[in-house]
């Protein structure tokens, strides 16, 4: 998955998707999370497909911190605040002593709430 991770870091999401399809490690929660992230962040996002990959990642690993964070951010894009808050609660349990993913999703939720009247 390293080449795909490098493409994501370079914000070349189309290349990341291509590399992930070649790697075809669909039994890996990390693979599903990276695919979901790349689909969500590409120039023309595909939120419905990204959501399917996040759900698959969480079915494989219910405590996958990256998938919990990124799926929560996707839900905010779909105006599903309650869903994002549920994922934040799951992240809180997955991060025994706090973690970056929890803080990032918490910040995204706060920003989302600040924009709503």
Residue ranges, per PLM feature:
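Structural signature of tandem alpha-helical TPR/SEL1-like repeats
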Residues: 10-15, 43-56, 78-87
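Terminal, low-structured helical/coil segments at or just beyond the last alpha-helical repeat
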Residues: 85-117
């Amino acid at each position: 998955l390293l080449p795909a991770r490098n493409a994501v870091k370079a914000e070349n999401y189309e290349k990341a998707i291509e590399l992930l399809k070649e790697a075809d490690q669909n039994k890996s929660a990390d693979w599903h999370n990276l695919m979901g992230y790349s689909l969500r962040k590409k120039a023309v996002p595909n939120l419905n497909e990204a959501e399917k990959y996040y759900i698959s990642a969480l079915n494989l690993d219910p405590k996958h911190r990256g998938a919990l964070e990124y799926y929560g951010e996707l839900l905010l894009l779909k105006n599903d605040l309650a869903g994002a808050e549920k994922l934040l609660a799951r992240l809180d349990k997955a991060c025994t002593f706090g973690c970056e993913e929890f803080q990032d999703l918490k910040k995204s939720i706060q920003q989302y709430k600040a924009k709503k009247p």
